[in-house]
């Protein structure tokens, strides 16, 4: 790694500290995983999105967003090589950038959507490294994180591992609870309707049976007296 590259890396780290931005680095051709945490209660019922900021003051162009039905936010949504999934109970939205290319480098945002408004959860600066075989240089990338001058910056390095995880268990439990609750309510309604249809006929049958029994008993009691 040349001195110019190291200087640029230090400059980017200092800039990210000033902008409260997380720096993530990944190798070209491999995958990079981004996790944005948020307040689960504050952002309850809101969709999440991953967008790319165009320029320093430009708009943020949306890349991918979570499922339109909030209860299904744990399902993975894909747009090209970018995948997003949201664990709404844990308060973590995960974005996976597959097959990183040099053009994927840039400034991104994790957003919480509320109608037409978008609240920034986290800013992420993605760096794509061109030489995945140079382990010596890759190890040197951790120097800015250990430096006391840039203590507040967050720099991470990603390798090509199968980082796709299964569906978040908390969201699955929530979905199963809703399904079971809906089935219970449906069964209760059917039982109430069936019982309501039986009620009108029941007293009539019982009344006729009681009347016949009473008449039969009356004939038996008055029979000996009349003869």
Swiss-Prot record:
Keywords attached to this Swiss-Prot or TrEMBL record, sorted alphabetically, are: Cell membrane, Disulfide bond, Glycoprotein, Immunoglobulin domain, Lipid-binding, Membrane, Receptor, Secreted, Signal, Transmembrane, Transmembrane helix
Q: Which cysteines are joined by disulfide bonds?
A: 36-110, 51-60
* InterPro entries given in the database record: Ig-like_dom_sf, Ig-like_fold, Ig_sub, Ig_V-set, Immune_rcpt_domain
**GO (cellular component) term, any one:** extracellular region
Q: Which top-rank group of organisms is this from?
A: Eukaryota
Instruction: List all topological domains (Extracellular).
Output: 19-171
Q: Which GO terms describe its molecular function?
A: amyloid-beta binding; apolipoprotein A-I binding; beta-catenin binding; high-density lipoprotein particle binding; kinase activator activity; lipopolysaccharide binding; lipoteichoic acid binding; low-density lipoprotein particle binding
- Residue positions annotated to bind a 1,2-diacyl-sn-glycero-3-phospho-L-serine are 67, 88
Which region is the signal sequence?
Answer: 1-18
Give yes or no: UniProt keyword Signal. yes
Q: Where are the transmembrane segments?
A: 172-192
The record ties this protein, via Gene3D superfamilies, to: Immunoglobulins (2.60.40.10)
Task: Spell out where the chain is glycosylated.
Answer: 20, 79
| Assembly and interaction partners | Monomer. After ectodomain shedding, the extracellular domain oligomerizes, which is enhanced and stabilized by binding of phosphatidylserine. Interacts with TYROBP/DAP12. Interaction with TYROBP is required for stabilization of the TREM2 C-terminal fragment (TREM2-CTF) which is produced by proteolytic processing. Interacts with PLXNA1 (via TIG domains); the interaction mediates SEMA6D binding and signaling through TYROBP.
What the protein does?
Forms a receptor signaling complex with TYROBP which mediates signaling and cell activation following ligand binding. Acts as a receptor for amyloid-beta protein 42, a cleavage product of the amyloid-beta precursor protein APP, and mediates its uptake and degradation by microglia. Binding to amyloid-beta 42 mediates microglial activation, proliferation, migration, apoptosis and expression of pro-inflammatory cytokines, such as IL6R and CCL3, and the anti-inflammatory cytokine ARG1.
Q: What is this protein called?
A: Triggering receptor expressed on myeloid cells 2
Could you tell me which species this protein originates from?
Mus musculus
Gene name of this polypeptide: Trem2
